[in-house]
């Protein structure tokens, strides 16, 4: 599998930062090459050209249409993270969800 570049977003980047750290740990255990950044939702546009996937906090479901507009024709997979793993910061479950797309 090629190196994946992933952006996680939440409201301010704090909770997505913890989740990104846990996904990094889960990926390292599997020897997967994944570059994960966590940012606030206001920064999405700045990263569209650099990422393969965008993982969105479940509380931001209301901006999915806006995100699709940002992405346009870019080849970026958008995943709405599930509350079941987001609320517990379960990096293994989040990684599984991500890998299903690739």
Predicted regions and their residues:
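Conserved active-site segments centered on acidic
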Residues: 2-41
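P-loop/Walker A phosphate-binding loop and immediately adjacent motor/lid segment at beta-alpha junctions
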Residues: 4-5, 9-13, 24, 64-86
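Short, well-ordered alpha-helices that flank and scaffold nucleotide-derived cofactor binding pockets
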Residues: 21, 25, 29, 69, ...
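Short, ordered loop/turn segments at secondary-structure junctions
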Residues: 41, 59, 83-85
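Generic structural signal for helix capping and beta-alpha/helix-loop junctions
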Residues: 44-46, 88
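Short acidic/histidine-rich motifs immediately flanking catalytic phosphotransfer sites
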Residues: 48-53
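N-terminal glycine-rich "phosphate-gripper" loop used for MgATP/nucleotide binding
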Residues: 56-65
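Ser/Thr/Gly-rich flexible loops in soluble cytosolic domains mediating phosphotransfer, phosphorylation
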Residues: 77-102
